[in-house]
Amino acid sequence: MERSPYSNTLLFNRNTKLSLSIGLLLLFPALVQGADSLYDQQILQARQGQYAPFLSYLQQYQLRHALTPSQVADWLQVALWAGQDDEVVKVWRRYQVYMPLPARGTAAAAQALRNQKQWQASLTLWQQALSQAPDSDDYRIGYIKTLADARKDGEALSEARRLVAEQASVAHLQTLSYVYLRLGKSWDQLLVDTQILDREPQNKAALASLMATLTRNRIDSPALGLANSVELTPAEKRNLQLNAAAELVRLADTPSREENARYALARTALAQYDAMIAAWHPDPQAAPDIIRARIDRLGALYANADYAQVIREYQNLIAQQQTVPDWAIGWVISSYIALKQIEPALTLIHQHPSWLTSQQNEEHELFYALLDTGQYPAAQQYVARFTRNAPYIRRLYGSPTPQPNDDWLTAQSLNVHYLAATNALPQAEARMQRLAATAPGNQGLQIDYAALLQDRGLPRAAESQLKAAESLEPASLQLERQQAWVALDLQEWRQMDLLTDDVVARSPRDLNTQRLARAREVHHLSDLRLSVGKGLHSDNPVSGTHDLSFETAIYSPPLADSWRLFGGHRFAEGNFEEGKGSRRQLFAGVEWRPRDYWGELELSSVNFHGENKPGVRLSAAHDVSDRWQLGGELERISQQTPLRALRNGVSANRGEGWLRWYQNERREYRVSVAASRFTDRNRRQEYTLSGKERLWQTPWLTLDLQPGLSASANSRTDTAYYSPARDLAATAALAVDHTLYQRYDTVWSQQLLAGGGSYWQKNHAAGAITVLGYGQRLRWNNVVDTGVMLNWDKRPYDGKRENNLAITLDANIRF
């Protein structure tokens, strides 16, 4: 039987020493008079822990003399004290045939058989001992403990409780504690051990038992607090210190705690580990404990969000040929994922597949990392595997009523996120709306539904959804984060700052919080906008040949939340039959961006036809709702004035009004009406209808139909620039957007445009329009968005089809 310094497994052995000594004194009066006989001297030595002299003496003595039952009982008890269980059983079997032995001898044999795990034989002897001495507490206790060892749980617990009910002494409570230990009821055992210590605060055995029970229940700091009251080996003391530090790591890694409290616990644990490792380093016996401390320390580093240090320490352990167990590898995997190093994380997951189903993967960070890196098949397999193991209901042992399965709800949520990330937003919204409607008290689902509405370009609907969810838990971090994202889309700058400040103060190291803080940081950066167009081959009368145009504009960081200053330069030139035409424009202005509104006022100096003229532009837009937006623009010396007109000294003032209807990311239309007044007294009206219809999508590709209808009328046709009396164009194009590479905030994609239509001009026959285009685009780190596009089109001008091949470059850089 296992002997533990924390378990009272051999209570009979120790408690019966005193009773044996008293019995021996009564049996041998000479001992009382001075203990002058050799036998009596050996008995006294055995009482003091020197068992060998007595056992050796008795071995020789029994060869020359017949032993009395009392002497055999002495032999059995001293051999039991010496831990010679085989000898006890052997002597018992030899002498119990010839003589009736005293109860104490029978009990010694019963204990030896118990130590040998011969439970049934031991129980039989305990019953025999109790029949000889029915009032013996020691024998009754030994019998109950053996019942517990034999896994006769019901009988052992019943007898132990009866014993305590008769008298709640320390010995009886210790017996009940032992039964609870064998039954695995560690919390019940903790209660009993606490009661024992309340009765005898200085009881060393009770202190040791309580310390062991606290350790089994992972209440390690109080267990360490008892260490100075109990005699422990250095290894046992180190184990308690490690357990106490590990308790801090577990507490720090609990998501339900406030972030500041978690980081404080993590820093405390790190300080303890550093102190322990430094103190134990000179001791070679402590080498295994140092390795354990270093492995446990990975959890403290992870809880402290020191992900890079987690990886460095893990690599050091591997370099030293140390094995990191499965229960610790999750910290390393999560650290790799947090640092956006998914490849080594996947390698470790392949080596430790049990991590996928462990509690360390409750946040499903691997799934979101797969989505962020465009590994959609792997993400789909992740969802499918999780869903297979998450039925709608689960049955709990002992309960006749099926219970809802939280894992099923998590699986549905993961599936919605997968659909949203793979461009299947209608299906994602339908599922999330159903989940949110059937669980109105689940704030997480309401927030996820709002996020999905925002992804579909409906921030006001998302705001309303979040407002309803606010009543459930107003101070929720997840809620405030999503409200900040929506406020950013709605241009609620002050609200966004307040929410972000609060979220950052409460969870500064949370990755989702850092992402939000990064978005706000980008919002407060300056903005450089650049666009360049170059005609490679063109013979049309609008742009001329070898045309070149570019525009640069720099916007300041936000001022007083809604204002930005801007300034820049525009240039355009082209070759025409009558010579080269050019336009240069320096401009500066102010932008206004409160909620639901946008406006720009621009003042400029325009150089064309050898002279400078002042220009003014006023642009405005109003978001009536998520669906409707209207706007307009007034401009003196309009940018839409044909370059050829400027070449010939003709400029135009222009006014435009437009209305946009937006259903979601799959459908939108825009209609505009514009009127231009040229200085040569020409009056132009323009009407445009354009739209987008999503036809097809995959995780990496979208296919859109872009219909267009435009018409114009000019009051004069005898102009130096292209000015048809009436014209009408109807086109339809297919636009493909294909993601070539995606890794977190870096996305590289290619675009393909192919379309055609018909063009009608008054006094000329209708002609075909053909449009082709190919381009690529790169978005990097939320601060660079740039693309290049090669376009070719062929359409009629005054009845003659002309070609135009051009390349355009645009960039938006935040700095």
Where on the chain are the PLM-derived regions?
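Short linear motifs centered on Gly/Pro in flexible linkers and helix caps
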Residues: 4, 9-11, 36, 70, ...
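Gram-negative and organellar
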Residues: 58, 68-70, 74-77, 85, ...
